[in-house]
């Protein structure tokens, strides 16, 4: 779809959506996004120019259906997939991608760290994906030196980053905010550093006693991103890995650096969103969102969860969806899903489904709470269908129609029950929604109540 659009931009030194927006240009991607969001296209352009919204759209990802991430638009959900050294291959990752797109992922991140040829896996995912693809290039950089972290150089990082950009990656997690002076700040934590990328860079800095090469070469990364319109997803290497560590000095020190890097990228018209925690108690979520907006000049916030408790392995799609709904309500632009396998193992396609549905619920709940235009229309339509016992319509409007139908049909599978005015919970005699009160009856009741009230007033007099 985008091949003709991007062909007109060939040869330009900066092809970012922010660059065009700041020139007053409305790109085809902006127009497409405005229609998807049901928002004025001028608003889309202005929000992108301001940096409060990004449209992740690498010029080499031509089969992309453009979308946006920002506080003015609907709350978005990302799904993580990716092969590990111990599990998965290309076909399994493509199945996860298909599952993620089917159940409404707005973006997908390929977090492959092994399982075969990483370039082959990534290019297959990009070719098959209509949604933006994000990556964490430091994983492949480490693989390129056979896991010997101390052998990594700045050129290794830049080479892999440019390769991902050439292949069509729309946004990349760049862990440029963790600095050597931040490392002593984690000494009082329970879980230390839980970011894989952050952990790699921390070990590199401790080994070499040198500053983070992604920080010192940040301007070189900006130049790559300008040429392909790759968006920064500034990684939070020092995010808390448990509720005890939330909002601590290490996390907030890195956040301040991320704000500085955000504004540095904006000076070159490169799009930025900022990643956030993690594990955060419910009473600290509002603070975290507002602090990010303050430090990062309202760049879109992209949070992992956050998990609001640490005691539910196997159910962390629930512990985190609670925090995600709250974060979305307070203004987070995109939620990174957590699956039931979090902290336990590599998710499969069914885990992707369960995690994604939990997060679609959280994002939708946030949209309703923020009174985004049309957010509740689907809820109202489903409620009407429920009251009218229109089972097929209820299934159709559900976030997961297959699961809704499956649960209904476990006990009442026959077609006749698709028109029945009850389900197996209440049966035919106890369903309260069978109590249909017509308008005439309510009018008569109102007259009676008014008359009774008047008589009582007279009696008091």
From Swiss-Prot:
E.C. numbers: 4.1.99.17
Classification via Gene3D superfamilies: 6.10.250.620, Radical SAM ThiC family, central domain
Biological processes, Gene Ontology terms: thiamine biosynthetic process; thiamine diphosphate biosynthetic process
Classification via InterPro entries: ThiC, ThiC/Bza_core_dom, ThiC/BzaA/B
Any one Pfam family match given in the protein's UniProt record, by short name: ThiC_Rad_SAM
HAMAP family recorded: ThiC
Family: Belongs to the ThiC family.
The protein's name: Phosphomethylpyrimidine synthase
Lineage: Bacteria, Bacillati, Cyanobacteriota, Cyanophyceae, Oscillatoriophycideae
């Amino acid at each position: 779809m985008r091949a003709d659009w991007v062909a007109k931009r060939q040869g330009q030194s900066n092809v970012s959506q922010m660059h065009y927006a700041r020139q007053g240009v409305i790109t085809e991607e902006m127009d497409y996004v405005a229609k998807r969001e049901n928002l004025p296209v001028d608003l889309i352009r202005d929000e992108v120019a301001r940096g409060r919204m990004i449209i992740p759209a690498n010029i080499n990802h031509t089969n992309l259906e453009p979308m946006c991430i920002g506080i003015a638009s609907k709350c978005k959900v990302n799904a993580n997939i990716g092969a590990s050294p111990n599990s998965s291959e290309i076909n399994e990752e493509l199945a996860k991608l298909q599952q993620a797109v089917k159940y409404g992922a707005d973006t997908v991140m390929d977090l492959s760290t092994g399982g075969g040829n990483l370039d082959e896996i990534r290019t297959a995912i990009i070719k098959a994906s209509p949604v933006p693809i994000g990556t964490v290039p430091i994983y492949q950089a480490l693989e390129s030196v056979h896991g010997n972290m101390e052998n990594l150089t700045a050129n290794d990082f830049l080479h892999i980053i440019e390769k991902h950009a050439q292949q069509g990656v729309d946004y990349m997690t760049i862990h440029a905010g963790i600095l050597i002076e931040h490392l002593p700040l984690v000494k009082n934590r329970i879980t230390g550093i839980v970011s894989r990328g952050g952990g790699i860079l921390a070990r590199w800095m401790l080994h070499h006693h040198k500053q983070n090469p992604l920080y010192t070469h940040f301007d070189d990364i900006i130049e790559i991103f300008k040429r392909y319109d790759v968006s920064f997803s500034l990684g939070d290497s020092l995010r808390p890995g448990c509720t005890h560590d939330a909002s601590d000095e290490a996390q907030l020190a890195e956040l301040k650096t991320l704000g500085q890097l955000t504004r540095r990228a904006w000076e070159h018209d490169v799009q930025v969103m900022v990643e956030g925690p993690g594990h955060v108690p419910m009473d600290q979520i509002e603070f975290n969102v507002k602090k990010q907006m303050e430090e990062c000049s309202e760049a879109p916030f992209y949070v992992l969860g956050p998990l609001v408790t640490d005691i539910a392995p196997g159910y962390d799609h629930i512990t985190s969806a609670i925090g995600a709904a709250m974060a979305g309500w307070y203004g987070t632009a995109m939620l990174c899903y957590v699956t039931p396998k979090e902290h336990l193992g590599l998710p499969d396609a069914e885990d992707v489904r369960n995690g994604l549905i939990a997060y679609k619920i959280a994002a939708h709940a946030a949209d309703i709470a923020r009174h985004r235009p049309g957010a509740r229309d689907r809820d109202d339509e489903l409620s009407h269908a429920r009251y009218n016992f229109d089972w097929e319509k209820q299934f159709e409007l559900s976030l997961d129609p297959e699961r809704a139908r499956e649960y209904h049909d476990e006990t009442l599978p026959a077609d006749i029950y698709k028109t029945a005015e009850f389900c197996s919970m209440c049966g035919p005699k106890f369903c309260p929604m069978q109590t249909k009160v017509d308008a005439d009856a309510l009018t008569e009741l109102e007259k009676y109540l008014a008359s009774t009230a008047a008589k009582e007033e007279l009696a008091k007099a």
